[in-house]
A protein has these predicted regions:
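DNA major-groove recognition helix of helix-turn-helix/homeodomain DNA-binding modules
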Residues: 52-67
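Short alpha-helical DNA-recognition segment
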Residues: 22-41
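Single-residue signature of alpha-solenoid repeat helices
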Residues: 96, 135-136, 174, 216, ...
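Residue signature of alpha-solenoid helical repeat architecture, marking inter-repeat boundaries
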Residues: 74, 111-115, 152-154, 192-194, ...
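Residue register of alpha-helical TPR repeats
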Residues: 78, 117, 156, 196-198, ...
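"A position-specific structural signal for the A-helix of alpha-solenoid helical repeats
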Residues: 82, 114-122, 159-160, 167, ...
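Amphipathic alpha-helical segments of tetratricopeptide repeats
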Residues: 100-107, 140-147, 179-189, 221-232, ...
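A short, Lys/Arg-rich alpha-helix, primarily the initiator
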Residues: 1-21
């Protein structure tokens, strides 16, 4: 399970004042959340090494976590979006949608790239977590625009607009956005390997959906090349699965690739993709499995 950990600067006296107002001692407030010494550091030294701890304390005290943070607002937003992203990777888009609804920030205090990152995740979770295509398109189109040069999140938003059109079965429009996004991606793929792997997978999945298996295989291999080049395991189980599926559809050997995808999905405890991999293996290789057992 991914954890949301970062050292943040806080206003410790806000915690102390709320605790005293509720007539709770440090031991009672800290119980089940953190050590008493950690709480003391929060209240007296304005240091919190785990943002989840701060959230839990604020929930117990019934105060807003934003009121206790003095860190640069962009750092707070980036941390919050990391949590949203972690949920999306596990295909927990409904939870991600609920998480991003809790994020409050002023656009005046954050840079353009971070705003475009927020708009991308807001659009993505509206689409896949709330099934609100109109809201999703609004955020994604805003997220795809830039007056100061493209950011990686502008490109991600373009890619996600492709996903929206794909879900609407408007495949010609989806193809326009997918192709445009991966064209722009060439300038970013090694600098932002995680985001590149996400987009190559999405694009491969689309081409697989419209039965252009050669293109799908090509994009899945592009994603795997980035993963190898940058030593990242991000989206690895998805890319391996997509490669295996399209190899099978092209009547090429695919069992070993499916086994690799299965291994990594199990390792990362990604139950979402694991179900698809197991179903394919059972369907595509049942006869060979039975022969091996004889």
């Amino acid at each position: 399970m991914c954890e949301w950990r970062i050292a943040v600067k806080i206003i410790g006296k806000k915690i102390k004042e709320a605790r005293k107002a509720k007539k709770i001692n440090q031991k009672s407030l800290a119980e089940g959340i953190c050590s008493q010494s950690a709480l003391s550091n929060i209240e007296n030294k304005n240091i919190c090494k785990d943002f989840d701890v701060l959230i839990a304390l604020c929930e117990r005290l019934e105060i807003n976590v934003e009121d206790c943070i003095t860190e640069v607002e962009s750092q707070y937003l980036d941390n919050a979006l990391k949590k949203v992203n972690a949920l999306c990777i596990q295909l927990k888009h409904k939870e991600a949608y609920q998480a991003i609804k809790q994020i409050n920030f002023s656009q005046k205090n954050v840079n353009k790239e971070l705003i475009s990152k927020f708009l991308f995740f807001k659009g993505l979770t509206s689409l896949l977590g709330n099934n609100d295509q109109e809201e999703a398109l609004n955020y994604l189109l805003k997220g795809s625009q830039s007056d100061q040069g493209l950011t990686i999140y502008n490109v991600l938003s373009l890619n996600a607009v492709g996903t929206l059109h794909e879900l609407q079965k408007n495949y010609s429009q989806a193809k326009v956005y997918y192709d445009k996004s991966v064209q722009f991606l060439e300038n970013f793929k090694y600098k932002y390997p995680q985001e590149a792997c996400r987009m190559f997978y999405n694009t491969a999945k689309f081409y697989s959906e419209i039965k252009e298996y050669e293109n799908a295989l090509n994009y899945s291999e592009k994603g795997l090349e980035v993963a190898r080049h940058c030593s990242t395991s991000y989206f690895l189980e998805y890319l391996l699965y997509e490669k295996a599926y399209n190899l099978y559809k092209l009547d090429q050997p695919a069992k070993e690739d499916y086994e690799q995808a299965l291994l990594f999905a199990k390792y990362f405890q990604n139950e979402g993709i694991l179900t698809y991999i197991k179903n394919d293996i059972d369907t595509f290789f049942r006869n060979s499995t039975e022969e091996n057992q004889m």
